[in-house]
Swiss-Prot record:
Its EC number is 2.7.-.-. Keywords: Exopolysaccharide synthesis, Transferase. InterPro entries: Stealth (IPR047141), Stealth_CR1 (IPR031358), Stealth_CR2 (IPR021520), Stealth_CR3 (IPR031357), Stealth_CR4 (IPR031356). One of its GO terms (molecular function) is transferase activity, transferring phosphorus-containing groups. Stealth proteins are part of a protein family that is conserved from bacteria to higher eukaryotes. Family members were first identified in microbes as proteins that help pathogens to elude the host innate immune system. Microbial stealth proteins are involved in the biosynthesis of exopolysaccharides. Stealth proteins are predicted to function as hexose-1-phosphoryltransferases. Residues 484-506 are annotated as: Disordered. GO terms for biological process: polysaccharide biosynthetic process. This is Exopolysaccharide phosphotransferase NFA_48680. Belongs to the stealth family. The keyword Transferase applies. The keyword Secreted does not apply. It comes from Nocardia farcinica (strain IFM 10152). Signal peptide: none annotated.
């Protein structure tokens, strides 16, 4: 029997998952540990790892030699020797009987998985060995579709606490791999907390706010944060740490976990004289002062979700250049004034600052997605626009003179100073969940799963009742992200409901 495409596990190896002997005269004595940056760029979820382990055991039991391969999109592939085609069919049939969904995207390629999202399934290829050459159904990270056997070296790679047969350099760091740590910061507020609502209402009565900025939509929450964090765990597992910037009590479902940290404003505002704040613009102007935050990080709101597996290169180049996503929506003419929303005003303040500094006029908003930032650039901006940062930092509510650092001041400043570029590869959707048209697209998003990100925004001028919105959004999120993250409590009290909103009310 040939063993060109890998080797067979012994009975003890199937139990221990420890592949440290050779077979068929092939030397698998070298075990290369996958560098952290390579493992991160693979963006492999727990669901995928579990299915890889299952298929590995089944192939070993069927005595089918195989290799672990990284494809051109950094997806993991099991490459089996086509001489064992009949046994591979038995393995896939057994997987289907065990609950795997099996599809065949092209000849000699089978996709298998138990997750409802095919992006987390494992692909199994059949490689043909013709004397001194090997033919693959597709190119991969290392080889073309046809290569000489003499040009490759068989080895093992340590990945997911196991050793896997592979080809030398298959998992070596590549110039396009992002090799630095990336954290994420979420801003969040529990609008159902009675103490918070009373304090906010009392202080808001003393100020003038823009259109829609006093609406409950600014603070409503139906556990979106729980699902946003689930989306990180599943679709961006390379993120090192999660910070939640909030002065609300920790959500009941959140347990102590080394990867998740609650950050209070008093601990990261450079000047605390303006606290408490109810202004997300103020919070966003102080992210660079969060202790322990990585140089490169993402910022997100609790209504933004990672919809499918994404790699670090979605946000940064290997050189650390950030990649941001412009929206088709134009900022529009006119200056900031108290009649506009805080969102629209901040875009105009940003535009004026950048025009004065660089002589360029920005015209577009950014998409509602997680955005990449660098602490060093933020600190530089805080010095460059010191008065604007200070004014926004001390603004308790959104004001007509606020800057919006994360949308879009940072990104265009970084672009105009050579530290950012726009990108058009991401597929995104913005959904107003208080509109009937918005709710109507949720099932399509779940069915197609072809987006990288989606935002489920809570509009300030609803067409539907709050109870209907809560029911439909909760149903959608529970179906899209059903698997708890490791930082969730086994059971937690239900959230406190907000007072019912009347359709059409602000």
């Amino acid at each position: 029997m040939r063993a060109r495409c890998g080797r067979i596990l012994s009975d003890s190896e199937r139990v221990e998952a420890d592949m440290d002997t050779g077979m068929g005269g092939m030397d698998f004595g070298t075990v290369d540990a996958v560098a952290g940056q390579v493992a991160g760029n693979l963006a492999v979820s727990e669901a995928t790892i579990a299915d890889l382990g299952y298929l590995r055991a089944q192939l070993a039991a069927a005595e089918v030699p195989f290799l672990l391969v990284r494809d051109r999109d950094h997806r993991l592939v099991l490459a089996a020797d086509a001489a064992h085609r009949a046994m591979v069919r038995r393995v896939t049939a057994a997987a289907a009987a065990a609950g795997f969904v099996c599809t065949q995207p092209q000849p000699d390629v089978v996709r298998l998985g138990r997750d409802r999202d095919p992006a987390h399934h494992v692909e199994l290829e059949l490689w043909e060995y013709h004397g001194d050459t090997v033919e693959c159904p597709r190119p991969n990270a290392l080889t073309r579709t046809v290569f000489d056997l003499a040009d490759v070296e068989f080895t093992e790679v340590r990945l997911f606490d196991r050793s896997w047969p592979t080809l030398a350099q298959m998992f070596a760091p590549q110039p396009t791999d992002v090799g630095f740590d990336i954290d994420i910061v979420f801003s969040w507020v529990d609008g159902s907390d009675p103490e918070f609502r009373a304090r906010r209402a009392g202080m808001m009565a003393q100020v003038v706010v823009g259109e829609g900025d006093d609406a409950d939509a600014r603070i409503r929450q139906i556990d979106e944060l729980k699902y946003a964090l689930r989306s990180v765990h599943k679709n961006a597992p390379w993120i090192r740490r999660i910070f939640i910037a909030t002065d609300s009590p920790a959500p009941a479902w959140l347990a102590e976990h080394p990867k998740v940290t609650i950050v209070r404003a008093i601990d990261h505002f450079s000047d605390t004289s303006g606290l408490p704040t109810f202004n997300s613009h103020a919070v966003e102007s102080q992210l660079q002062h969060i202790e322990g935050l990585s140089e490169h990080f993402l910022y997100s709101n609790d209504d933004m979700f990672f919809a499918r597996p994404v790699r670090p290169s979605m946000f940064f180049t290997p050189a650390g250049i950030s990649r941001f996503i412009e929206a088709d929506v134009r900022i529009g003419p006119g200056r900031n004034n108290e009649r506009r929303s805080g969102y629209e005003n901040a875009a105009r303040v940003n535009r004026a600052l950048l025009a004065e500094r660089f002589g360029h006029v920005i015209t577009r908003h950014l998409e509602h997605t997680p955005v990449p930032l660098r602490r060093s650039v933020l600190r530089e901006m805080e010095e460059e626009f010191a008065a604007d940062f200070a004014r926004t930092r001390t603004s308790r509510f959104r004001a007509a003179t606020d800057i919006s650092v994360t949308n879009s001041l940072y990104h265009y400043y970084a672009l105009l100073t050579g530290r950012a570029v726009p990108q058009e590869a991401a597929r995104v959707a913005y959904v107003d969940t208080t509109s009937r048209a918005g709710l109507a697209v949720l099932d399509d998003i779940a069915a197609h799963r072809d987006l990288d990100f989606f935002c489920l925004n809570d509009g300030s001028f609803p067409e539907i009742s709050e109870s209907e919105r809560v029911r439909e959004v909760s149903r959608f999120l529970a179906g899209y992200f059903p698997d708890p993250a490791p930082w969730e409590r086994v059971s937690a009290p239900s959230r406190r409901p907000l007072p019912e909103s009347t359709a059409g009310a602000a």
